Amino acid sequence: AGQHMITVEYDDSLPEGQYYLYMFNNNYGKATSIPTFDWSMYPNVGNFKSGTSYYSKFLVDEKTRTYKLAQQFSLPYSAIVSSVQHLGGNIPFSSGMSKTFGEYDKDGKLIKSFEYEADKYSYRVMKYEF
């Protein structure tokens, strides 16, 4: 299933060879290169118009060649585009197709969200500290 904006996050508290990957997990099932792919084998994968997107964070261990889900919470659905980032201990996000952006705290509790009207989707929303 689809994802958007994967970020590598190194953490000095982790053992050597470990790091985090976090992403806006669109959770949209489409494979244009394999049009006959059977997405029914993957329960809860969204279609273009509806589904559930997620903030997903994985702990990667290169020494053992494994990964595990470290944190996940649902976001407003968007089959395409969208973004998440880590900033100041919080998680700003944008969900392009739902025309929503906002911020969650580190535990996945919504702080504030905004909706906008537009003919097109926002590709990304980034927050900066000046």
Positions of PLM-derived features:
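Histidine-/acidic-rich catalytic cores in large beta-rich domains
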Residues: 1-130
